[in-house]
């Protein structure tokens, strides 16, 4: 019984230990002053001037080492394992641990079931619950705070509270109620440029790139693939990422615009005195270096008899008296001897000079190089320098080439160190190897003291001198008369950032528990002795600001009462009044002390754990109202074409990876990735299979095929110079004759041989290979040709009345009967019959030849029309040819002696006669055969 009571008292006393108070065991009798110079073990502070336990630690009862941690709020049913860190029974760690619940919970009632309470013990409901009395006691019902909440976005009611959520593109502010715009650009969703907007963002690309169909990536623009009329380079174009590079063919060089090319001679032309302004000195005569002959330097003439140099050509050094000629330079060297009467002694006669150089009115051709004042290179001391280049010359001079002129001056030296060494041995600029200090040169790494400053130590490093003076430690004055760098300083002590005079006594830890003394520059501290206690260790109490433990007074019977709802908490009880960020403790005097924890948002999308004060960034992310774990990927709600990942409370989104297998993919609306079906050609959609022409190239025809675009030049129809007619009608006898239009035409003789019909491009529809012939029509045409060759020798027979109404032999799909579309009227008995119609033989061999008379023309008109169609019909395709074997065809042709049997042997289809087989008049028929 007593053991349980003592244990209960110990649980109450331990949480009352403060971080600023210390308890020490094993002290000597009161009145005994002990100066402990050093304390051994871990967690010891003030080592060297006395020692004590660091804040948050206390000496243990056995060894006296500082190994007993102190927890300010107590650990309840847990164990204090570090300063203000408790290890609870459920394995969690925190500033405190909940008390072990018995029949009643933390609030005096079991709130785990229906949020109820115990009427006899306490009547309390947590914040967010409404207390109601029932027949079985107190019941706590959840309050829907969303009915009157101040959420700017969407309110979600929870048990005991509510949570505010924001829509897409917005995030919750620090007040947990209002919404603010989410800067999506921080997650780098765009490849190049990103512009944030309220609830959204927009990607763009730099110059030389265009936005991909996914609206996030940037694709390089190939400037070199433009048509010839819009090409960017004069000669050759090389595409680069985001730009392009132009090059020129041999003999040309790029102009300043880096796009066009100009002619450039292979030989180096030296600037000449005659082509320079009056105010500029001459540098070199007009002399071109050739193979086997080097160029001359200014002020030097070629040696006598030197090979490769023409006689009389030399360099000059006197100023020029001739103005610049606004003409182009000659590209050939003038190798005429210089006469003695020449004012400069460098060039040939005026006639040769004028012919070679030109006059002011001479045009400047595109292949002529431009030199003189506008030249982009310089010739100096036998070398060529580009315009804008600088170089050093012997004698500490620096030269500059600018627009063909060389300007030399003194070398400008920029010192890169504080103490450079002056130049030696003909040098131009000082050196930073070594130091020049106080009139003396110091070697690299030399340590020295300046004159009259023995207490100052300097070092030379890379031309810089750094000096330091020794800092004299405090201490008593020395009796030695020898002078040194440090002066005599009275004894002082420096302790915890403050100086104390010799003999001063002060508190070491900011309280009265430690006493320190400054003696001869050293601090000695000792702890205040504590009396021995007669009460057991469990009843020790260390009050605020006290140095020694005292025995606990009898515990008062009352704790901390809350007047609003009648709840009473025992002394030392820690609870949260409803907000997990606020903790309250019941003090020993019955007062309640509450402290609120301020949370700092360390990530944009933390997770709020119920019952936990601050959001947690390590558990995952809360994004668009959903919770994601770390390293979890998910599609973006703002843009389905983005893939996002959660990383420690932060969300990073990037475009979905789209595999593209074609050159011109088209990105349909609402799709994340472009597809290789239609084409996106120069920003416009081209349907698959569509043929189109370029806007600036009407003669170029392109076609879109599954995301690829291929172009070709449209072939133009050649002029008709040698027409030909199909040979499937009947044999022609051709001869050349001029056409009325001045073209070379042909003449075709008809079947009787007495009429020549002129043939030109308009009368011949095209070569017979335009469409394949059908076997049946071709066979009938051959039969007609055979009968036509014997028609002149055939004797007339008595007219045979054709009473059969059976159709003639017809190919499949072609009706050989009367035309349906434009059938001519039947001729009357007295009307003349066309000679051609009267000479047509029967269609089948073995049938008697019957001359056509006016009486029989009406009955035989269908047969004649069919024969005429066979002579002029366009061959059909093989797909339209009737299915018939050669055996069936030969059997039909050899056993049938009438058109009725032929028509019965072959299939007959009622298809109409083609448009081109319709015969209007006999005259028109003869003109087309």
UniProtKB/Swiss-Prot annotation:
Keywords: Calcium, Disulfide bond, EGF-like domain, Glycoprotein, Repeat, Secreted, Signal. Residues 339-353, 889-903 have a biased composition (Low complexity). Glycans are attached at residues 454, 464, 787. Residues 70-98, 142-180, 181-219, 220-262 form the EGF-like domain. InterPro entries: cEGF (IPR026823), EGF-like_Ca-bd_dom (IPR001881), EGF-like_dom (IPR000742), EGF-type_Asp/Asn_hydroxyl_site (IPR000152), EGF_Ca-bd_CS (IPR018097), Growth_fac_rcpt_cys_sf (IPR009030), vWF_C/EGF_Fibrillin (IPR052080), VWF_dom (IPR001007). Residues 743-755 have a biased composition (Basic and acidic residues). It is found in: Secreted. This is von Willebrand factor C and EGF domain-containing protein. It comes from Mus musculus.
């Amino acid at each position: 019984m007593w053991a349980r009571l003592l244990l209960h008292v110990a649980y109450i006393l331990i949480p009352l230990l403060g971080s600023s108070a210390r308890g020490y065991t094993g002290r000597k009798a009161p009145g005994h002053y002990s100066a402990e110079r050093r304390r051994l073990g871990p967690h010891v502070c003030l080592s060297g001037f006395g020692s004590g336990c660091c804040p948050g630690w206390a000496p243990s009862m056995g060894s006296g080492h500082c190994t007993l941690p102190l927890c300010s709020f107590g650990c309840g049913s847990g164990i204090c394992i570090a300063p203000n860190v408790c290890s609870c029974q459920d394995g969690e760690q925190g500033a405190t641990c909940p008390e072990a619940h018995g029949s009643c919970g933390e609030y005096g009632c079991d709130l785990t079931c229906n949020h109820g309470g115990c009427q006899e013990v306490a009547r309390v409901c947590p914040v967010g619950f409404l207390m109601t009395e029932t027949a079985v006691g107190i019941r706590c019902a959840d309050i829907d705070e969303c009915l009157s909440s101040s959420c700017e976005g969407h309110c979600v009611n929870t048990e005991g509270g509510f949570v505010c959520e924001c829509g897409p593109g917005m995030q919750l502010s620090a007040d947990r109620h209002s919404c603010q715009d989410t800067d999506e650009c921080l997650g780098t969703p765009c490849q190049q440029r990103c512009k944030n907007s309220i609830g959204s963002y927009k990607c763009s690309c730099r110059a030389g790139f265009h936005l991909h169909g996914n609206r996030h990536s940037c694709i390089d623009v190939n400037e070199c693939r433009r048509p010839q009329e819009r090409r960017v380079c004069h000669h050759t174009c090389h595409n680069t990422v985001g730009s392009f590079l132009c090059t020129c063919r041999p003999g040309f060089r790029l102009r300043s615009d880096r796009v066009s090319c100009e002619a450039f001679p292979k030989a180096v032309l030296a600037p000449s005195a005659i082509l320079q302004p009056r105010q500029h000195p001459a540098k070199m005569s007009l002399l071109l270096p050739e193979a086997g002959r080097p160029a001359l330097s200014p002020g030097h003439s070629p040696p006598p008899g030197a090979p490769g140099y023409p006689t009389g050509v030399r360099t000059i050094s006197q100023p020029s008296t001739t103005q610049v000629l606004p003409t182009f330079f000659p590209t050939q060297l003038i190798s005429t001897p210089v006469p003695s009467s020449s004012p400069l002694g460098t060039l040939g006669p005026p006639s040769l000079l004028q012919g070679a150089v030109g006059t002011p009115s001479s045009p400047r051709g595109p292949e002529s190089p431009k030199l003189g004042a506008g030249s982009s290179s310089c010739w100096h001391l036998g070398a060529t320098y580009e315009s804008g280049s600088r170089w050093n010359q012997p004698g500490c001079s620096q030269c500059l080439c600018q627009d063909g002129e060389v300007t030399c001056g003194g070398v400008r030296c920029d010192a890169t160190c504080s103490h450079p060494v002056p130049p030696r041995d003909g040098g131009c600029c000082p050196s930073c190897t070594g130091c020049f200090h106080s009139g003396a040169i110091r070697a690299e790494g030399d340590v020295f003291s300046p004159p009259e400053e023995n207490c100052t130590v300097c070092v030379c490093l890379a031309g810089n001198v750094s000096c330091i003076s020794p800092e004299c430690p405090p201490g008593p004055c020395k009796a030695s008369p020898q002078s040194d760098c440090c002066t005599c300083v009275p004894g002082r002590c420096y302790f915890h950032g403050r100086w104390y005079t010799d003999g001063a006594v002060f508190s070491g830890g900011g309280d009265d528990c430690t006493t320190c003394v400054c003696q001869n520059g050293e601090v000695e501290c000792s702890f205040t002795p504590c009396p021995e206690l007669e009460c057991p260790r469990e009843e020790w109490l260390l009050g605020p600001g006290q140095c020694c433990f005292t025995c606990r007074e009898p515990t008062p019977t009352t704790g901390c009462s809350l007047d609003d709802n009648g709840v009473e908490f025992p002394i030392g009880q820690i609870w949260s009044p409803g907000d997990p960020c606020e903790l309250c403790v019941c003090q020993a005097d019955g007062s309640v002390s509450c402290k609120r924890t301020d949370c700092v948002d360390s990530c944009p999308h933390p997770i709020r754990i119920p019952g936990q004060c601050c959001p947690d960034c390590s558990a995952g992310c809360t994004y668009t109202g959903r919770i994601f774990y770390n390293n979890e990927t998910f599609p973006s709600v703002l843009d389905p074409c983005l893939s996002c990942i959660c990383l420690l409370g932060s969300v990073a989104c990037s475009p979905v990876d789209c595999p593209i297998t074609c050159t011109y993919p088209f990105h349909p609306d609402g799709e994340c990735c472009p597809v290789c079906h239609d084409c996106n050609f120069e920003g416009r959609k081209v349907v698959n299979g569509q043929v189109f022409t370029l806007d600036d190239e009407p003669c170029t025809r392109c076609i879109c095929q599954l995301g690829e675009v291929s172009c070709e030049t449209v072939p133009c129809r050649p002029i008709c110079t040698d027409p030909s007619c199909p040979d499937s009608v009947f044999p022609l006898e051709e001869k050349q004759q001029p056409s009325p239009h001045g073209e070379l035409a042909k003449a075709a003789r008809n079947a009787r041989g007495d009429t020549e019909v002129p043939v030109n491009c308009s009368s011949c529809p095209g070569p017979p290979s335009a469409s394949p012939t059908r076997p049946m029509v071709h066979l009938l045409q051959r039969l007609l040709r055979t009968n036509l060759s014997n028609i002149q020798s055939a004797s007339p027979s008595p007219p045979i009345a054709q009473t059969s109404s059976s159709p003639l032999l017809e190919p499949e799909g072609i009706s050989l009967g009367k035309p349906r579309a434009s059938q001519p009227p039947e001729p009357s008995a007295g009307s003349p019959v066309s000679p051609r119609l009267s000479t047509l033989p029967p269609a089948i061999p073995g049938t008697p030849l019957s001359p056509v008379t006016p009486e029989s023309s009406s009955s035989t008109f269908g047969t004649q029309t069919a024969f005429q169609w066979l002579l002029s019909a366009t061959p059909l395709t093989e797909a339209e040819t009737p299915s018939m074997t050669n055996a069936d065809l030969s059997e039909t042709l050899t056993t049938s002696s009438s058109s009725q049997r032929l028509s019965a042997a072959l299939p007959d289809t009622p298809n109409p006669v083609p448009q081109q087989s319709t015969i209007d008049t006999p005259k028109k028929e003869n003109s087309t055969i």
